[in-house]
């Protein structure tokens, strides 16, 4: 059986999930405080710096529009996530991290056993498997649904069930953007960017940075779409 415990990418996902969990715990006591918003804004700022590193690759108008578009949803999504109350913040954390960790875990354990060599997104993210995608989404939705069931908040919070699927969409858009610019992953950008060198002191090398930034991107994408849904449906939050 595949040794998940020794897989670096899985460890990165777990570390990212735990980090966001710790951020949520900090928010439990300081959610409206300036330090909490600074921490969250720092993650978003790192992602924006990463995005503008893409300009070194190509300068076509289409690529610039893509970067500006993702920068827009990074800003909107981060503002939304930073302003929601703690209860809804937890929904987003459960949805995004639940999908990411379990999609990777189930993909490694069961990937290819049912759908063989077939891949759901071969031209965007060839390593994703049907098994991992389905089970990751199911786990994410289940975690959010359990929380809603306990709080009996389905009627007002139903849109947060989309946190996992939206995280997948954000991840795919990020993968598309990287392919468009000929970048394999966030690590490649960060290794070449001196701005991120100091992070190696805290996360033990460059392997973890891409994981952090990708999760911020997914969270921001999720936040942006949820904000649009809430504004359109006039649901209070």
Features from the language model and the residues they span:
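Interhelical loop and helix-boundary elements at the membrane-water interface
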Residues: 1-18, 27, 49-225
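Hydrophobic core segments of transmembrane alpha-helices in multi-pass, intramembrane catalytic enzymes
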Residues: 20, 41-44, 222
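Short, hydrophobic transmembrane alpha-helix segments
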Residues: 24-37, 54
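Juxtamembrane helix-loop transition sites at the ends of transmembrane segments
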Residues: 34, 153, 192, 235-236
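Loop-to-helix transition at the N-terminal end of transmembrane alpha-helices
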Residues: 34-51
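Juxtamembrane boundary at the C-terminal end of a transmembrane helix
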Residues: 228-237
């Amino acid at each position: 059986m595949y040794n998940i415990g020794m897989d670096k990418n899985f460890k990165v996902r777990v570390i990212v999930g735990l980090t966001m969990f710790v951020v949520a715990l900090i928010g439990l006591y300081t959610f409206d405080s300036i330090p909490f918003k600074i921490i969250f804004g720092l993650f978003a700022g790192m992602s924006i710096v990463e995005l503008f590193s893409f300009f070194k690759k190509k300068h076509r108008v289409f690529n610039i529009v893509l970067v500006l578009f993702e920068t827009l949803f990074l800003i909107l999504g981060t503002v939304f996530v930073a302003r929601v109350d703690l209860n809804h913040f937890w929904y987003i954390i459960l949805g995004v991290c639940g999908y990411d960790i379990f999609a990777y875990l189930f993909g490694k354990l069961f990937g290819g056993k049912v759908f063989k060599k077939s891949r759901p997104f071969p031209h965007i993210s060839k390593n994703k498997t049907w098994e991992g995608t389905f089970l990751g989404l199911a786990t994410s939705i289940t975690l959010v649904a359990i929380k809603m069931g306990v709080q009996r908040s389905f009627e007002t919070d139903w849109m947060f069930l989309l946190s996992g699927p939206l995280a997948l969409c954000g991840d795919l858009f990020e993968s598309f953007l990287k392919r468009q610019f000929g970048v394999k992953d966030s690590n490649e950008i960060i290794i070449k960017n001196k701005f991120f060198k100091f992070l190696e002191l805290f996360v033990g090398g460059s392997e973890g940075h891409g994981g952090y930034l990708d999760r911020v991107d997914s969270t921001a994408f999720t936040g942006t779409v949820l904000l649009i849904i809430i504004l359109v449906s006039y649901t209070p939050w």
